[in-house]
Amino acid sequence: MAEYKDTLNLPNTSFPMKASLSVREPEMLADWQAKGIYQKIRKARVGSKRFILHDGPPYANGHLHCGHALNKILKDIIIKSKTFSGFDAPFVPGWDCHGLPIELNVEKKVGKAGSKISPREFRAKCREYAASQIDIQRDEFQRLGVLGDWYNPYVTMDYHYEANIVRALGLMIKNGHLQQGFKPVHWCIDCGSALAEAEVDYEDKTSPSIDVAFSAVNPSEFLNCFGTQPAVKPLILPIWTTTPWTLPANEAVCLHPEIDYALIDAGNSYYIVATDLVESVMARYGISHYKTSGSAKGRVFEHFKLQHPFYKRQVPVVLAEHVTTESGTGCVHTAPAHGPDDYLVGQSYQLPLINPVMANGCFAENVELFAGISVLKANETILTVLSERNVLLASESIRHSYPHCWRHKSPMIFLATPQWFVSMDKSNLRQAIINEIDKVNWVPDWGKARISNMVENRPDWCISRQRSWGTPMPLFVHKTTRELHPDTLELIEKVAVMIEKSGIDAWFDLDSSELLGDDAKHYDKITDTMDVWLDSGISHYSVLKHNNDLDFPADVYFEGSDQHRGWFNSSLTTAVAMYGVAAYKTVLTHGYTVDAEGKKLSKSKGNYVALDKLVNQHGADILRLWVASTDYRHEVSISEEIIKRNADAYRRIRNTARFLLANLFDFNPASDCIDAKELLELDRWALKRCQLLQEEIITAYENYHFHLIYQKIHNFCAVDMGSFYLDLIKDRQYTTAKDSIARRSCQTAMYHMVKAFTIWLAPILSFTAEEIWQTIPGNNSESIFIEHWYDAWPTIDAVNMEDWEQLHIVRDEVNKALEETRQRGEIGSALAAEVTVYADAKALPKLTRLGEELRFLFITSEAKACPISQSPKGLAVTDCGVSIQVTASVHEKCARCWHRREDVGQNQEHPELCLRCVGNISGYHEERLYI
């Protein structure tokens, strides 16, 4: 055999089987950066239609995790696929830089602003810290193969951006959406600041569950409503609460106007509770003997007076729709300073809005009984006071969902404080937003209902914060009237210009008289900063509308599902408030990263998968394949086992590319491509299959169905290529003459296929695709990412794809029969066998048409097809309507092609060869038509 090895066209390539991604990827990344590949991509698409995917800014704090990788890789896949589709698709990454997490990290190092360090110095340290985090994250994002304008990102702490935040506030004021108010807001005691809805997490908490007696000041007026004769015993409206610390702020008891309330005679006292809750309430109070003495609607008790349980003041009965009979008593404790529903009721009844709690979470010194006590520790004291006054009707502990600070994980409180709000209803903003939601394409479609519900139910947006590191609210309010300065809009622009030059310190350092002159003595300068969700939310204004490479509105916003209450919401609200339209045309949402069992990733649970470890161990392309392989619309599972499965799939893809490249080692596209009319039918089938598959893949990219692309490519490698085409062409590729039509036909097809295949891969397996691209013979562009979807297909005659589908099916059945024969020990390899296929009228013509080439379909030494009527008795008929007979060949094996042929040894000069091989090494070009 040794003397004939050199006569074979054995594959050869510099493209390695072992990927060594952790070594090659950084080298390729450095090459992209050195060559300015991103800039060259943009240059190649100058004048093309733009596609804008606007990047939601991650927070500049800490190393990236798998959730970051999922998000940025998905975006990168979209950008690259759009570039291949001919769009000019710039990608400008962003970072969110103000806010509490950065403050907390800086505080650990230098202390709180205003104590060990001045606020100005503190802000400088925050800016310095955020910049260092951006550098870390920039490198980590680029390591994932994400292309973009990484050294010209948008950064919310840039002076230009900060100035535009201020200008955006001015636009919202101009349009009538800003209002100030003393309202209850989510308040984090640890932060010392108000928080927005998006900064609140709901977690389980154990709280006291108590029932408290509010006694009627005049029982007779209540009893008269039931038509009951007055009696000399107390009448109680019991309330139920899980926040006893709010009782000092109680100003009313609220009933539902249309709920039926029962008068319960319990012997020593009367109780009024919702009819539907009588049984559960009496059981809770341990009262087994009672009777119902009447029923009345809640509305009849309006304005009746009750005695506060431990203060001398009397409080009214008020009415509201938020009262339910799902739990409690149907009588709701109402403290306008400590809840949004309570506040609204208080406003409608003009109840006192008295806040007994200070910003540090402690009761003020003038609060009777509880002065100086933290509200987080006050419940026990309050229960003692209630017990001493015999008004505690029931008490137990319950586990329930309760708002917590997203950063500190500590329980929050509702606290009435002077704040600034974007009013959802003052200028009909809520309805305008809902109207815009209908115009947006939401993927998945449940996103529309989710954000609609949030907008419909959200309170006014509290945008003021009591923090140091944030964009200031550059407002002046009159010391007496508390009205904004009449020249507010002009003043805001002046401050914006100052911030653009010197940053936010320009406002904090400003003496009011510099802008107001003598008027300064009449106005207070606001020191609040703005909600960071407003910072990122106005990126449509500061970035899309101010960057000439971008457009407004964006084609796509794409973030995790938590951003329906975060960035999607703040972007939508601000855009509609500023110019009346949504900031985006389409919103895509991906799920969270979870472990293999669907549980949240956590270091404490031991299921956390470190991103840097994955990248260093497996390579970024394996991670990118993981992203593409999952349906991102649901939760996305990750584990070492899942990554290993993706690594296996990657090897199949890489080996497919390597096989194609290895068989093009002596192929020059400029001189060796043959005319389409000369292509063998199998090659024409393969090219047609690729063209059809490319259409499916492009459609899937356009629809953002990346998991379908993964499936299609994997199936193409495993089935169309691995188990069919590449298997069939080996004999022709290796044994026919180097320059024969048969071989060049195959190489021509493989050349077109590998170019198309590599571009399909490129949005997903970016590093590997570039590596393949640089190995493909011919004059290729500097980078694959400058290319379009492959369109240099040869024009081929119609191929009967159904015929080849049938041949593929029959081949699979033959392979099963060969394997069974091998298992019985009758043959070794398939080339040791001869096959007869007995086929029905549908399959027979397709098989006989191949003639002598039928054996190449089965990779056996001999093959023939006969009518099924000639099938020997007892030979099973397969599902595809054929019977298969396998026999061991009795002929000698050709030392070159390994086929067992009757003519082996007939040539005296080459006694070990079949005559076909003799011809191929003697300059005779073997003719093939089909395979």
Swiss-Prot record:
L-isoleucyl-5'-AMP binds at E559. GO terms for biological process: isoleucyl-tRNA aminoacylation. It is found in: Cytoplasm. It catalyses: tRNA(Ile) + L-isoleucine + ATP = L-isoleucyl-tRNA(Ile) + AMP + diphosphate. A motif ('HIGH' region) lies at residues 58-68. PROSITE patterns: AA_TRNA_LIGASE_I. GO terms for molecular function: aminoacyl-tRNA deacylase activity; ATP binding; isoleucine-tRNA ligase activity; tRNA binding; zinc ion binding. CDD domains: Anticodon_Ia_Ile_BEm (cd07960), IleRS_core (cd00818). Catalyzes the attachment of isoleucine to tRNA(Ile). As IleRS can inadvertently accommodate and process structurally similar amino acids such as valine, to avoid such errors it has two additional distinct tRNA(Ile)-dependent editing activities. One activity is designated as 'pretransfer' editing and involves the hydrolysis of activated Val-AMP. The other activity is designated 'posttransfer' editing and involves deacylation of mischarged Val-tRNA(Ile). Monomer. IleRS has two distinct active sites: one for aminoacylation and one for editing. The misactivated valine is translocated from the active site to the editing site, which sterically excludes the correctly activated isoleucine. The single editing site contains two valyl binding pockets, one specific for each substrate (Val-AMP or Val-tRNA(Ile)). Belongs to the class-I aminoacyl-tRNA synthetase family. IleS type 1 subfamily. This is Isoleucine--tRNA ligase. It comes from Legionella pneumophila subsp. pneumophila (strain Philadelphia 1 / ATCC 33152 / DSM 7513). The gene is ileS.
